[in-house]
């Protein structure tokens, strides 16, 4: 109890009375925040670093952990899967990855996205004949039905996803 009082007094003396603006407002929007409480007349907001994102991207995108995980979540999936073979050092991958995640999220669960780092999962990259990154595969019922290499704009990605969903 004493710790809460001390924390409340400290926060009262440190935190400004203005609501978050600018960069902080954008960081706290679209997040699940803990309840606000009143400390000496001030409304205390949680730190943006302690918020939980609840965007659809988190629900439709996953990182492949190993070969059996790929088999279970991609090959055996009843939902069509877009597989993004990428690398940490790849510049175009850093552009395509978020763009592709956004487009997959817009499909509302009709397709999911698996991300495979080729440096961590060389065996999968070899098995699926990935010779350059980014390489994106469309897998439906365990079979590769489409593929592209390189960066694409949003219109091309949308057409790629629509073709996969059918």
From Swiss-Prot:
Pfam families: Thioredoxin (PF00085). Residues 1-59 form a transit peptide. The modification N6-succinyllysine is found at residue 152. The keyword Methyltransferase does not apply. The keyword Acetylation applies. InterPro entries: Thioredoxin, Thioredoxin-like_sf, Thioredoxin_CS, Thioredoxin_domain. It is found in: Mitochondrion. The active site is at residues 90, 93. One of its GO terms (cellular component) is nucleolus. The record marks 84 as: Deprotonates C-terminal active site Cys. The record marks 91-92 as: Contributes to redox potential value. One of its GO terms (molecular function) is protein-disulfide reductase activity. The modification N6-acetyllysine is found at residue 152. It comes from the Eukaryota. Important for the control of mitochondrial reactive oxygen species homeostasis, apoptosis regulation and cell viability. Is involved in various redox reactions including the reduction of protein disulfide bonds, through the reversible oxidation of its active center dithiol to a disulfide. Monomer. This is Thioredoxin, mitochondrial. It comes from Mus musculus.
């Amino acid at each position: 109890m004493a710790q809460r009082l001390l924390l409340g007094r400290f926060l009262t003396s440190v935190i400004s009375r203005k609501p978050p603006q600018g960069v902080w407002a954008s960081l706290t929007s679209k997040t699940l925040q803990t309840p606000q409480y009143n400390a000496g007349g001030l409304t205390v907001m949680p730190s943006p670093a302690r918020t939980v994102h609840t965007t659809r991207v988190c629900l439709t995108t996953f990182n492949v952990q190993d070969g059996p995980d790929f088999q279970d979540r991609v090959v055996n999936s009843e939902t069509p899967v877009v597989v993004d073979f990428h690398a940490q050092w790849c510049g175009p991958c850093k552009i395509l990855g978020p763009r592709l995640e956004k487009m997959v999220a817009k499909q509302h669960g009709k397709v999911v996205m698996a991300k495979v780092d080729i440096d961590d999962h060389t065996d999968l990259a070899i098995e699926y004949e990935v010779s350059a990154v980014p390489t994106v595969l469309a897998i439906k019922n365990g079979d590769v039905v489409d593929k592209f290499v390189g960066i694409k704009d949003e219109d091309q990605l949308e057409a790629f996803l629509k073709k996969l969903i059918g």
